Regions:
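Acidic, metal-coordinating catalytic segment for phosphate/diphosphate chemistry
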Residues: 1-34, 40
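Nudix hydrolase/Nudix homology domain
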Residues: 58, 70, 97, 102-106, ...
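A short, polar/proline- and glycine-enriched secondary-structure boundary/capping micro-motif
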Residues: 25-27, 55-59, 133
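The catalytic Nudix box helix
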Residues: 45-46, 63-96
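Short loop segments at secondary-structure junctions
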Residues: 10, 39-42, 50, 114-119, ...
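A glycine-rich, hydrophobic loop/mini-helix early in the fold
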Residues: 32-64
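A residue-level structural signature of the nucleotidyltransferase/glycosyltransferase Rossmann-like core
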Residues: 4, 43-44, 132-133
Length: 177
């Protein structure tokens, strides 16, 4: 059973938790993280989701994403998700939060990392990840057009690639890394 911390609209923890999969109440929010790992030659490590996954099954996606569990900080969740899904150990110093997107019932923190990784040595989490590969922005946008990548707005892919080399933004209320 996975528990999530519940936040208010200003991203303050409420002191309450909820079980994953339960409906969220109005005014309740949870924390999600996405991590984009880039190679030194500017390609993003992307993953293909398992065909039996709920939501976007069998489609390609950015490197890693997942929900923060109760007690996690954003950066803890980011490091844990990368370790669990693709077997890469990252220190907090390697993770750089580049932006936060508010969505219906949550906050989605995006991190970028530049790290050359030998994909043949990765330990993929069977429950989540089918395979991984390196791809540039044009290849990812072509995959979106082909319907084999999660249908992000293509300009958002450009933003992710832009942020790999530039400092991102954070909310005024969130000054922690």
């Amino acid at each position: 059973m996975e528990l999530w911390d519940i936040y208010d609209k200003d991203r303050n923890k409420t002191g309450r938790t909820m079980k994953r999969g339960e409906p969220m109440k109005d005014g309740d929010y949870h924390l999600v993280v996405h991590i984009c790992i880039f190679s030194s030659d500017g390609k993003m490590l992307i993953q293909q989701r398992q065909p039996f996954k709920d939501g976007w099954s069998n489609l390609w996606d950015i490197t890693v994403g997942g929900s923060s569990v109760a007690g996690d900080t954003s950066i803890d969740a980011a490091a844990r998700e990368v370790r669990e899904e693709v077997g890469i150990q990252l220190s907090p110093a390697e993770l750089r939060k580049t932006m936060t997107i508010d969505f219906g019932h949550g906050f989605d923190d995006f991190y970028t990392v530049t790290k050359d990784v030998d994909i043949s040595s990765l330990k993929l989490q069977y429950e989540e990840v089918q395979q991984v590969k390196w791809a540039d922005a044009d290849e990812i946008k072509s995959m979106i057009d082909e319907g084999i990548f999660i249908p992000y707005n293509k300009s958002f892919i450009d933003v992710l690639f832009h942020f790999k080399d530039h400092v991102g933004t954070r909310t005024a209320a969130d000054t922690s890394v």
